[in-house]
């Protein structure tokens, strides 16, 4: 919630409202629909193709390995996953690092999916706590040891113009406050180039690009905002974080999106039966168009390793 000009004081974090309707309009389309074109782990963010011959499932596991390896996880720690999706990162962390997990999601379908997955875990092999909540970061205030957020930050800003990004201030302060003195956080988000990089890349803004951006913000991710690296730097440092590493992996989103589009096309009849022809066409346009954006470097992905 952005304060009005007549009331410049910042809104207290717990009075900020999570974008529940906007998030559910996309992620609650139906689990069955997403299963048609995501990999078996249901990971819905840029994969990491360490080698070009990896399958999408292998590349998604490599991405989770990459992200989790930057956190310094130890057995018994508690990992907070903000925007946990369908839970693949939490399950990976439990399996590989023997940690407790808390997942936050605004999707009712993802909540139900994660509860089922947690119930399937062999409790004779681990007694770690596994908690998933229908809750935004705005209401979270419990101590944790590490934080990860993959492909959710794009939903955290609000409104148009620079004022909409001020929610980042509250987000990073919450993260800083719940972490211990040696706390670490991995933030994986789509980014856009600043003016200098845009010029260096020779990027232009044709009408076709503007139409596609409007399509994405209207039909796919209403309310979505993409940050620049400088904005992550600014708001995270305001909270007290230092960026230990910037790791740009946007080139890997091209094969990720291409794999998703190919899988959706291969399941065209099933997708139409589930959601109708219009939704099928909309998602094909979204996936193929976004692949072009990453190919041409209008968008990128950066993993920020943040330390206290």
Swiss-Prot record:
InterPro entries recorded: CFA/CMAS (IPR050723), CMAS (IPR003333), CMAS_actinobact (IPR047672), SAM-dependent_MTases_sf (IPR029063)
Q: Where is this chain's protein located in or outside the cell? A: Cytoplasm
Record-listed E.C. numbers = 2.1.1.79
GO annotation (BP), single: methylation
The residues that hold S-adenosyl-L-methionine are 44-45, 79-87, 105-110, 137-138
| Source domain of life | Bacteria
Instruction: Quote one Gene Ontology molecular function term.
Output: cyclopropane-fatty-acyl-phospholipid synthase activity
GO cellular component annotations, sorted alphabetically?
cytoplasm
Which residues does the Swiss-Prot or TrEMBL record annotate as the active site? 290
Q: In which pathway does it act?
A: Lipid metabolism; mycolic acid biosynthesis
Q: Which Pfam families match?
A: CMAS
Q: Which UniProt keywords apply?
A: Cytoplasm, Lipid biosynthesis, Lipid metabolism, Methyltransferase, S-adenosyl-L-methionine, Transferase
User: Which Gene3D superfamilies does this entry report, sorted A to Z?
Assistant: Vaccinia Virus protein VP39 (3.40.50.150)
Give the stretches traversing the membrane: none
What reactions does this protein catalyze?
a 1-acyl-2-(9Z)-enoyl-sn-glycero-3-phospholipid + S-adenosyl-L-methionine = a 1-acyl-2-(9-cyclopronane)-acyl-sn-glycero-3-phospholipid + S-adenosyl-L-homocysteine + H(+)
The entry's family comment says:
Belongs to the CFA/CMAS family.
Subunit organization: Homodimer.
Q: What does this protein do?
A: Catalyzes the formation of trans cyclopropanated ketomycolate or methoxymycolate through the conversion of a double bond to a cyclopropane ring at the proximal position of an oxygenated mycolic acid via the transfer of a methylene group from S-adenosyl-L-methionine. In the absence of MmaA2, CmaA2 has a non-specific cis-cyclopropanating activity and is able to catalyze the conversion of a double bond to a cis cyclopropane ring at the distal position of an alpha mycolic acid.
Question: Cross-referenced NCBIfam families, in alphabetical order?
Answer: mycolic_MTase
Protein name per the record = Cyclopropane mycolic acid synthase 2
Naturally occurring in which organism (per UniProt): Mycobacterium leprae (strain TN)
Name the gene.
cmaA2
């Amino acid at each position: 919630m952005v304060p009005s000009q007549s009331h410049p004081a910042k809104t207290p974090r717990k009075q900020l409202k999570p974008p529940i309707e906007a998030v559910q309009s996309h992620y609650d389309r139906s689990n069955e629909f997403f299963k048609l074109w995501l990999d078996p782990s249901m990971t819905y963010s840029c994969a990491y193709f360490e080698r070009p011959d990896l399958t999408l499932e292998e590349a998604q596991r490599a991405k989770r390995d990459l992200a989790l390896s930057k956190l310094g996880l130890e057995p018994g720690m508690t990992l907070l996953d903000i925007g946990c999706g369908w839970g693949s990162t939490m399950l990976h962390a439990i399996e590989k690092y023997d940690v407790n997990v808390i997942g936050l999601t605004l999707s009712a379908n993802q909540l139900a999916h994660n509860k089922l997955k947690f119930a399937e875990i062999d409790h004779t092999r681990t007694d770690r706590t596994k908690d998933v909540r229908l809750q935004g970061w705005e209401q979270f205030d419990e101590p944790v040891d590490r934080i990860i957020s993959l492909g959710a930050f794009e939903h955290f800003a609000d409104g148009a113009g620079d004022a909409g990004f001020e929610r980042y201030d509250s987000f990073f302060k919450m993260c800083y406050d719940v972490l211990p003195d040696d706390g670490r956080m991995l933030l994986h988000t789509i980014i856009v180039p600043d003016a200098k990089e845009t010029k260096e890349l020779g990027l232009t803004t044709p009408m076709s690009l503007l139409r596609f951006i409007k399509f994405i913000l209207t039909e796919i991710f209403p309310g979505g905002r993409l940050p620049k690296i400088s904005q992550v730097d600014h708001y995270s440092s305001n909270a007290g974080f230092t960026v230990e590493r910037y790791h740009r992996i946007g080139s890997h989103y091209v094969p990720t999106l291409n794999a998703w589009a190919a899988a959706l096309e291969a399941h065209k009849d099933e997708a139409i039966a589930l959601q109708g022809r219009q939704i099928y066409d909309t998602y094909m346009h979204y996936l193929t168009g976004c692949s072009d954006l990453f190919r041409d470097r209008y968008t990128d992905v950066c993993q920020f390793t943040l330390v206290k």
